[in-house]
């Protein structure tokens, strides 16, 4: 079953895109309609998203699709989409993992198929001091790939190995072969623009290329840990100006070129744009392109920091519309959440689980982010036609991803917990609480030791064709699938994903997690996948989300319950007005006690409850608490 997910920014919504954190952008005509479509690459998870441009004159209309995903090569950390051979098709320059360089894919697409051919690997070289040497570009450095000398072929600017000065690698394709299709470079300038980066902060020193001249430079301990480099004529004088952003700093610095056509010389620096400077943690990268189809390039900005915890999670794609011209731009901030406005985006991380949150017999989605804040997508539809509404409950949990399931079929819910290590702990419910049975359940370990010592395991249990299966999300982005049995080590059966959900990819963004259930009662399991991008992706169905804004929010201190654990009488104190009833449910979602609220403090008689774990729900599920009955 294949679904083309539509996202219509400004006119409609597609909530199930998956969230955005730290993005780079490109343009390419994917559907051959004469309009360049938008490519979005989120480095926090190495996800490439394709948006078809359906906007008319002065209209913003981008529709998300997965149709072209498999045609693109696997991209890592950064990407530049640019046509290096002049054939009208954008090629791909991207980071070469493990080599501190870049590899190149040539666009060899036809009208029938999108296709790329790897032409440079493991890294692109230039002639430097008597030999061909790797053009240095780390995972934390975003290079400028642009025609610097006006001869038509693309040159490269990137910080040198010492990290203080910008090096120019001149493309000699035109000089040697009188064509654009060769990638032959020579380092011709070790201090392009005559500008140097301070060792101590993000200050740039102008008109200097000498160590110790107007700069404090420690040759033994260079500070440079990453930067983004972008060049563009921003004042209409025909000279390429320089935009820089530095790791750990939120802004863009514009350095104005006061040199000439033969030599760049930066003479002035200022925050950019002047009308509303960028303030995005950390190390923003700009991209100039016409977003609203008026023939004038606008500005997109997003964080570039390789550290996933350093980026902005919810307002991480700033769009500035150009009210001027390309020669004399006037960038005015339009939105801080371009494309994110119409999707479910919980910030950093999204770990879903299926639960009847409010005891109404409908399956809801509970989503926890990386910082352990909980949000609920309340099902306001029907059994056959679910529809979700977003509710913030502002509960906080420790980082331990857990799921409840009667694993041993004794009528008591058991508890399975994931952890940072990537293993699982299994607790059996016994009526008085939970007893630890194994802290290495099924010998599950989802760590990828080649890249990390952490796993961030997120478990969920579900039945498929009469068998109990265990899905475990992971830091590396894979969803592992195991067959639960009495054996010490569970059998991995991840191949079953192609049977359960044929259109689901093998790898998602980093810190993946899934919830699996038949949400619409059609006999087919739906799979809801979250990742560090902070959003959700839905497979095997299309279910609407009626309201992407939070309908109501409770603060964590607005309700107090005591004592907990409780023997007979549970006191519920609401510190703000609430309506309707208070409910007590078991963890299957069955309502056991329902009582009207008559005062700010309500006393519930729970003496007849069987000892165990219960859920207290207030104000139609807007706020919930767990308590233990002794």
Predicted segments with their positions:
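Short, glycine-anchored, charge-dense loop/turn motifs used at functional sites
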Residues: 585-592, 614
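Short strand-edge motifs at loop-to-beta-strand transitions and within beta-strands
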Residues: 602-604
